[in-house]
């Protein structure tokens, strides 16, 4: 008799981190507009898959907020935004969103499991993205860095950063590969919506891959 159990996603406990995608950085970052394209796709997927989104800004009072192109998607995903001065996104305010809290009688279980699969897009690959990934790995989480969703001021920094992160234990992959790995099964409820998203963004995906991975 066929198993009628509904299929589960391959990656079940995820969070998406969007790192420092601010207006002031846009002119200086190599292929920044292509990073935006990938971030938009990832955020649309987060809405469909109900994956929580966390955003940081670096010293927003001086460097401004997140780029306008991402704001509507951040709003519909209910993203949490944290301002910081550290380079890593894994600041105490961020950790508090993932930590269990202790009550007077017993521990109150967090809505998040102890081990997450954290997906990172943003800038700069060799500074804030790298330090965020290293801190998350040290905290026991799995890290997915989307190679078509990160960049730096100097393009030569990007492959160096990604090579280091692979060596440290992060998974360096593409946004489309991550999407299909997240689902794991074409029978999950959200498959049709994600397949439609992939089709709608296929031209942007090709542009981003061609631009950001051309030297890798």
Annotate each PLM feature:
Residues 1-88, 92, 103-108, 134, ...:
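Active-site acidic carboxylates
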Residues 88-89, 127, 150-155, 179-181:
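Short gly/pro/ser/thr-enriched loop/turn and capping motifs at secondary-structure boundaries
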């Amino acid at each position: 008799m066929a198993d009628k159990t509904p299929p589960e996603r391959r990656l079940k406990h995820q969070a998406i981190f969007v790192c420092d995608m601010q207006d002031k950085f846009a002119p200086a970052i190599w292929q920044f507009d292509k990073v935006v394209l990938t971030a938009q796709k990832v955020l649309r997927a987060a809405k469909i898959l109900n994956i929580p989104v966390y955003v940081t800004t670096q010293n927003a009072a001086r460097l401004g907020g997140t780029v306008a192109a991402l704001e509507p998607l951040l709003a519909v995903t209910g993203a949490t935004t944290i301002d910081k001065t550290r380079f890593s996104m894994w600041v105490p305010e961020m950790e508090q969103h993932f930590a269990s809290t202790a009550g007077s009688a017993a521990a109150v279980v967090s809505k998040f499991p102890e081990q997450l699969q954290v997906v990172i897009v943003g800038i700069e690959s060799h500074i804030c993205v790298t330090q965020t990934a290293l801190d998350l790995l040290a905290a026991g989480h799995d890290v997915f860095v989307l190679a078509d969703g990160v960049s730096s001021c100097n393009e030569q920094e990007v492959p160096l950063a990604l090579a280091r992160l692979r060596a440290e234990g992060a998974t360096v992959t593409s946004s489309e590969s991550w999407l299909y790995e997240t689902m794991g099964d074409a029978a999950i409820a959200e498959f049709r919506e994600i397949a439609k998203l992939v089709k709608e963004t296929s031209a942007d995906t090709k542009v981003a891959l061609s631009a950001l991975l051309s030297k890798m």
